[in-house]
Amino acid sequence: MILAVGSPTGHVHSVITGMISYVAKGVQVADGQTRMLYTDFDGDGDRGVFLLNLSGQLIGWVTEQMEAEETAGASLAMPISEYKWMLEQLSNGVSIPYFGILGQDVSDSMLGDGIPRGVYITESIADGPAYSAGIQSGDILVRFGDQDISSLREFQGCMEETKSGDTVSVVIRRKSIDEYREIEYDVVIGAR
């Protein structure tokens, strides 16, 4: 059981109880992946709804209401544990580094189709640092600075060690007519 506090009913200082009905792993977010908590109550992220466990500890916040007919009355929440390092940075007056991609690990089936190991960029976010440097959707990120990248978690680890304003040399592999060719870009890390 969890408590939803803030304004889950639309009224300030309201509280309702509920459950986390499902935890989705590997949900794509800018520059990484996260877990997403599915709750069994109707809460709107625009209203300021926070989730507490029964010990009173903050465990997440509601981000959006699910609109699909089969999931009506449910909400999506972000678990606070996934954002601990960001919260520490922000509370110390340090901006969060921003590369500007959505990506996924190259799966075994993708490897079987000839896609090289790395992070498959599903979207190079418009006007983001990666996009501005020339990185495109469909590219495979294989090196970030001096670190070979074979998974999104490795990329996230590199980003946590990077500062806004740093220039990082990255290597991607891009599909040409019959092969993937390596291209190196210098990307100026942004802030968010």
Language-model features and meaning:
Residues 1-3, 51, 141, 168:
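Generic structural signal for buried aliphatic residues
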Residues 1-12:
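Short glycine/Trp-rich loop-beta-loop segment that forms part of the substrate-binding cleft
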Residues 7-8, 64, 146-147, 173:
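Short, surface-exposed secondary-structure boundary micro-motifs
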Residues 48-50, 112-115, 129-140, 161-163:
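A short glycine-leucine-enriched loop at secondary-structure breakpoints
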Residues 59, 130-152:
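Conserved PDZ fold ligand-binding element
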